[in-house]
Amino acid sequence: MHSTPIQDALVPMVIEQTSRGERSFDIYSRLLKERVIFLVGQVEDHMANLIVAQLLFLESENPDKDIHLYINSPGGSVTAGMAIYDTMRFIKPDVSTMCIGQAASMGSFLLSAGAEGKRYALPNSRVMIHQPLGGFQGQASDIEIHAKEIIQIKQKLNKALADHTGQPIEVIENDTDRDNFMSADEACDYGLVDKVLTRR
């Protein structure tokens, strides 16, 4: 069984008193009851499947109540990230996003994809945007195919970032050409988040 960074760490347990006695939950399951999802660590297929499942479950529980997605991620797989992105856009509840720590690469893309007016960052968090990374070895014809694919993905991500931030596509193309790090306030000015929160 594949494990995630959360599974590898010691996960706190919460004990609740109910009319039927005590029930114990791991902290993430307990927070899921409050409609809080954590996107922590590398964005990869296993993590994406878990987040998609949680989004769909919370929609089935209440399609009218916001879902809160907390992000602390260095980024990762574009296809895994797009599975989360498409599900966020597909479901009925608004998905509010919050950057805690860092949201880089695909993490920043998902941060910007939160519901309008409900995208937040904590004051010391960092955000980084850049173009998708590619690495492929093989025959020249296969490399050419993969190069075309990554250019198409880059164009699609840039268009979505332009839509979410309100920045012109030319600005996005220029700013994502290399790693572009921002403070929480800079990310807010850029349009990646709507507000920097210092207190609840």
From Swiss-Prot:
Transmembrane segments: none annotated. Its EC number is 3.4.21.92. It is an enzyme of class 3 (hydrolase). Keywords: Cytoplasm, Hydrolase, Protease, Serine protease. GO terms for molecular function: ATP-dependent peptidase activity; ATPase binding; serine-type endopeptidase activity. One of its GO terms (cellular component) is cytoplasm. The active site is at 105 (nucleophile), 130. The keyword Nucleotide-binding does not apply. It is found in: Cytoplasm. GO terms for biological process: protein quality control for misfolded or incompletely synthesized proteins. It catalyses: Hydrolysis of proteins to small peptides in the presence of ATP and magnesium. alpha-casein is the usual test substrate. In the absence of ATP, only oligopeptides shorter than five residues are hydrolyzed (such as succinyl-Leu-Tyr-|-NHMec, and Leu-Tyr-Leu-|-Tyr-Trp, in which cleavage of the -Tyr-|-Leu- and -Tyr-|-Trp bonds also occurs). Pfam families: CLP_protease (PF00574). The keyword Cytoplasm applies. InterPro entries: ClpP, ClpP/crotonase-like_dom_sf, ClpP/TepA, ClpP_His_AS, ClpP_Ser_AS. Coiled coil: none annotated. Cleaves peptides in various proteins in a process that requires ATP hydrolysis. Has a chymotrypsin-like activity. Plays a major role in the degradation of misfolded proteins. HAMAP family: ClpP (MF_00444). NCBIfam families: clpP, PRK00277.1, PRK12553.1. Belongs to the peptidase S14 family. This is ATP-dependent Clp protease proteolytic subunit. It comes from Hydrogenovibrio crunogenus (strain DSM 25203 / XCL-2) (Thiomicrospira crunogena).
